[in-house]
């Protein structure tokens, strides 16, 4: 947890969208992820898209699992609803949020370890049910939070920091989602 806070003063020249909000109104907390981590780019893209489309932040539900990627929902849409679920179980929790309030726009954030390992069954069934949600998988082929073990999506033959090769074929979540009937991949 960081104790660094973002200033709440808005620059007078920041563009304002149809809701009277600036891009800063769609941001969240200061990131605590490693410098250069691609997960921050995902958060920045969500902030930009929601601001440009004038989507009201309070109409979003963000749910994540466990891992580096699951820290990212706190970095975007600060005025939205959020929940960190247990490892691999984000799809069930966001399905519940979706069923409880059909007016919410649901974003599920998960990592490759969270979705392709312990949560693979959950991933398959939420896609098969065609739950109305955006399911983001931040896939870097590694368990970054625990410092570098291969995830189930890592390419065969890749080597770890210690030079050990990955002996297994990767699970291709994109192909699996398409095979299960996902409409937007």
Task: Show where each model-derived region lies.
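Iron-sulfur (Fe-S) cluster-binding modules
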Residues: 1-60
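Glycine/charged-rich beta-loop-alpha catalytic/anionic-binding loops adjacent to active sites
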Residues: 23-31, 71-83, 104-106, 153-160
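Catalytic cores of large soluble enzymes that bind and process phosphate-bearing ligands
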Residues: 34-38, 82-85, 165, 169
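Conserved active-site and cofactor/substrate-binding residues in soluble primary-metabolism enzymes
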Residues: 40-45, 57, 88-92, 121, ...
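Structural motif
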Residues: 59-62, 104-107, 132-136, 175, ...
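Thiamine diphosphate
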Residues: 66-142
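Glycine-rich, charge-decorated loop segments at or immediately adjacent to ligand/cofactor-binding or catalytic sites
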Residues: 144-149
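Conserved thiamine diphosphate
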Residues: 150-185
């Amino acid at each position: 947890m960081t104790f660094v806070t973002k200033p709440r003063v808005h620059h007078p020249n920041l563009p304002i969208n149809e809701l009277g909000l600036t891009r800063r109104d769609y941001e969240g907390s200061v990131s605590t992820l490693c410098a250069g981590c691609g997960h921050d780019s995902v958060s920045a893209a969500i902030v930009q898209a929601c601001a440009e489309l004038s989507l009201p932040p309070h109409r979003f539900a963000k749910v994540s699992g466990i891992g580096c990627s699951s820290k990212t929902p706190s970095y975007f849409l600060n005025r939205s609803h959020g929940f960190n679920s247990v490892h691999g179980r984000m799809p069930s929790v966001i399905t519940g949020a979706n069923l409880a309030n059909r007016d919410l726009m649901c974003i599920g954030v998960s990592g490759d370890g969270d979705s392709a390992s312990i949560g693979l069954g959950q991933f398959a069934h939420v896609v098969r049910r065609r739950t109305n949600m955006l399911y983001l998988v931040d896939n870097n082929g590694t368990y970054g939070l625990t410092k570098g073990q291969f995830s189930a999506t890592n390419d065969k033959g890749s080597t770890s920091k210690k030079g050990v090769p990955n002996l297994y074929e990767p699970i291709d979540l994109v192909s699996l989602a398409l095979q299960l009937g996902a409409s937007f991949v």
